[in-house]
Curated annotation (Swiss-Prot):
Expressed by the venom gland. Residues 21-66 form the WAP domain. Belongs to the venom protein 11 family. 01 (wap-1) subfamily. It is found in: Secreted. One of its GO terms (cellular component) is extracellular region. Contains 4 disulfide bonds. Has antibacterial activity. Disulfide bonds join C24-C54, C32-C58, C42-C80, C47-C62. It comes from Lycosa singoriensis (Wolf spider). Residues 1-20 form the signal peptide. GO terms for molecular function: toxin activity. Coiled coil: none annotated. This is U15-lycotoxin-Ls1b.
């Protein structure tokens, strides 16, 4: 009996984690001068601690996901380079 209760509780906890939508946070900056654009990362693997590779007007940065939509995941690709983008 206890194992059935545990299994149900575990399943509910697992589903709540899997089904909760996560997004990159919306940037508070709407524009950035070209000389200030830089990429801190070029893929999710560059980020640590559960943060994601997100796009902002000033470049790509590792950001922690939020439950509010509005941000943008970065596209990346082979042409992405870290550092300032001139």
């Amino acid at each position: 009996m206890n194992s059935k209760i545990f299994a149900v509780l575990f399943l509910l906890a697992f589903l709540s984690c899997v089904l909760s939508d996560q997004y990159c946070p919306k940037s508070s900056i709407t524009a950035c001068k070209k000389m200030n654009i830089r990429n801190d990362c070029c893929k999710d693997d560059d980020c640590t601690g559960g943060s994601w590779y997100c796009a902002t007007p000033c470049g790509n940065f590792c950001k922690y996901p939020t439950d509010r939509p509005g941000g943008k995941r970065a596209a990346g690709g082979k042409s992405c380079k870290t550092g300032y983008v001139y």
